[in-house]
Swiss-Prot record:
Keywords from the named record: Cell membrane, Membrane, Polyamine biosynthesis, Spermidine biosynthesis, Transferase, Transmembrane, Transmembrane helix
Keyword Protease: no
Protein name per Swiss-Prot or TrEMBL: Polyamine aminopropyltransferase
Organism annotation: Mycobacterium tuberculosis (strain ATCC 25618 / H37Rv)
Membrane found in the keyword field: yes
Role played: Catalyzes the irreversible transfer of a propylamine group from the amino donor S-adenosylmethioninamine (decarboxy-AdoMet) to putrescine (1,4-diaminobutane) to yield spermidine.
Gene Ontology CC entries for this record: peptidoglycan-based cell wall; plasma membrane
Binding site for S-methyl-5'-thioadenosine: Q261, E333, D365, A366
Renumbered residue ranges of the record's region Spermidine synthase: 203-478
EC number: 2.5.1.16
SUPFAM superfamilies given in the database record: S-adenosyl-L-methionine-dependent methyltransferases
InterPro entries, per database record: PABS, PABS_CS, SAM-dependent_MTases_sf, Spermi_synthase
Catalytic-site annotation from UniProt: D386 (proton acceptor)
């Protein structure tokens, strides 16, 4: 009877410890994925990170998982100590990873230096995460928690906990850690969770496997690692602020990290600049050249309603409100953080345009809105497409045949669409790709370009759903403009031999050529 009771108690303890261990497995898996997502996010924010960079990072991480599983084999005979060491090192490296990469981007002059930090961080984190499962499997098969005969069931439980933890990490990063804490603090908090999980495993499970002195040493090491990450957490704001300022020549006066992008506003004297993910969007010294060239060719004298896709800074809306006869402006912007900055920090620049009763602001993805929007029965007299350069697949779809076909449904008969199309000099293939893509959606297109000192030679596309390409013209009712007039606009349609027109295959959702064009253009 006594032996039966003892066996039952042992079984109950085994189940309890197994649950604790599997919970720790899930926590460690969540932490491992968060570390990699943090590196991916930071690389994308600071370096643009397209599909090629993302694919290489993910592939490198997966390869490192396998390498870690192989390299840990000689230490399986000392699985308990090895597990504690792996978790301590992983917690430190993972917790510090975002701060280290941020510092590398900020303080290393050469891109190769920060790329090396990213590659090393990916390899180390992947290798350490890959070592976890073999170590845990070995511990589970030592008879105190599970028997060797249950190896298949044990492996299934480990995999289930591992994948469930990865799911939790994948959801926690974009919906909780990144928006609430930011990249550096989010990674640091994850490191603390990682080390705490290792501590739980050490206290409740490994005390039966290692000596008392070894356990105390391990716990002290974990505590020291926790102290290091906690110190980073306390000073993370100073680190981030100092590092961020290193990336910009002028003092930063506003910063947001939204669910979509990093937004920075700088000011030096009267020169105010807006950056999205490190890319300059406008400079107040010359933005009027860009904005006037974008807006006025698209609005005829009789235009009443205008759709603006992108342009959340409010500059296009500012100019539209100056044009007599405009009664309605629908402004579609993906990122509410951009709208918030436009209504506060940028209010003097855009003249409070987004708070004008004639402007209706919609927070939505431009393509999604076009697919499901309640377009006025008569359509819009003009559509202004003022979107970021298509240097990622997400942005590339907004420069596709399918996108322009959707925009056509929003145009009134005879209405005009204008698209900012990048630089015909710096990114000529991308520029002419956009022109060809718009034509593939059934438009007749007239390309034109102007000089914007901050950007250099910058191009646009004026399009209409007719067989005859529209002639760019400044409306006769236009207000007094600082830069654009009919003579300037006529000259803008002339392209020199080194940037002469060419016909290319259109960029589509299936084949987003434009993204690769942008990458090669700026390279």
């Amino acid at each position: 009877m006594t032996s039966t009771r003892q066996a039952g108690e042992a079984t109950e303890a085994s189940v309890r410890w197994r649950a604790v261990l599997l919970a720790a497995v899930a926590a460690c898996a969540a932490c491992g994925l968060v570390y990699e997502l943090a590196l991916l996010t930071l690389a994308a924010s600071l370096n643009g990170g397209g599909i090629v960079a993302t694919s290489l990072i993910v592939a490198g991480y997966i390869a490192a998982l396998g390498a870690g599983a192989l390299l840990i084999k000689p230490l399986l005979a000392h699985a308990a100590i090895a597990f504690i060491a792996v978790e301590a090192v992983l917690g430190i490296i993972g917790g510090l990873s975002a701060a280290a990469l941020y510092a590398a981007f900020a303080f290393l002059d050469e891109l190769d230096g920060s790329t090396l930090v990213l590659a090393v961080g990916t390899a180390l984190i992947g290798g350490l995460v890959g070592a976890e499962v073999p170590l845990l499997m070995t511990l589970l098969q030592r008879g105190r928690v599970a028997g060797a005969a249950d190896a298949g069931r044990t492996l299934a439980n480990l995999n289930a906990a591992d994948y469930l933890g990865a799911l939790v990490g994948g959801l926690a990063w974009p919906f909780l850690l990144l928006p609430q804490l930011g990249m550096i603090r989010g990674a640091a908090v994850t490191g603390i969770v990682n080390l705490a999980a290792a501590g739980v495993v050490s206290i409740f499970l490994l005390r039966h496997v290692v000596s008392g002195r070894q356990l105390v040493t391990a716990l002290c090491a974990l505590a020291a690692a926790l102290g290091l990450i906690a110190t980073l957490l306390v000073h993370s704001h100073d680190i981030e602020t100092t590092g961020r300022q290193q990336l910009y020549a002028d003092p930063i006066i506003a910063y947001r990290h939204s669910a979509y992008q990093e937004i920075v506003v700088t000011r030096r004297g009267d020169d105010l600049r807006l950056y999205l993910d490190g890319g300059l969007q406008f400079c107040t010294r010359d933005e009027y050249r860009y904005t006037e060239s974008l807006v006025y060719p698209a609005v005829s004298d009789g235009a009443r309603s205008v759709l603006v896709l992108g342009g959340g800074d409010g500059l296009a809306a500012r100019e539209l409100l100056r044009q007599p006869g405009i009664e309605q402006i629908v402004q579609v912007e993906l990122d509410p953080a951009v709208i918030e900055l436009a209504r506060t920090t940028l209010r003097d620049v855009n003249a409070g345009s987004l708070d004008n009763p004639r402007v209706h602001v919609v927070i939505d993805d431009a393509m999604s809105w076009l697919r499901g929007a309640a377009v006025p029965p008569a359509g819009f007299d003009a559509v202004i497409v003022d979107l970021r350069d298509p240097d990622t697949p997400v942005l590339g779809r907004l420069y596709s045949t399918e996108f322009y076909a959707l925009a056509a449904r929003a145009l009134a008969p005879g209405g005009l669409m204008v698209v900012q199309a990048g630089s015909p000099y710096s990114t000529p293939t991308a520029f002419w790709r956009i022109i060809s893509t718009i034509r593939s959606a059934g438009y007749a297109v007239t390309p034109y370009h102007v000089h914007v000192p901050t950007f250099g030679d910058w191009g646009f596309a004026l399009a209409r759903l007719t067989d005859i390409a529209p002639t760019p013209a400044v409306p006769s009712t236009a207000p007094a403009l600082r830069f654009l007039d009919q003579q300037v606009l006529e000259a803008a349609t002339v392209f020199s031999g080194d940037i002469r027109p060419r016909t290319l295959d259109p960029s589509t959702l299936d084949n987003p050529h434009i993204v690769e064009d942008m990458r090669h253009g700026w390279d």
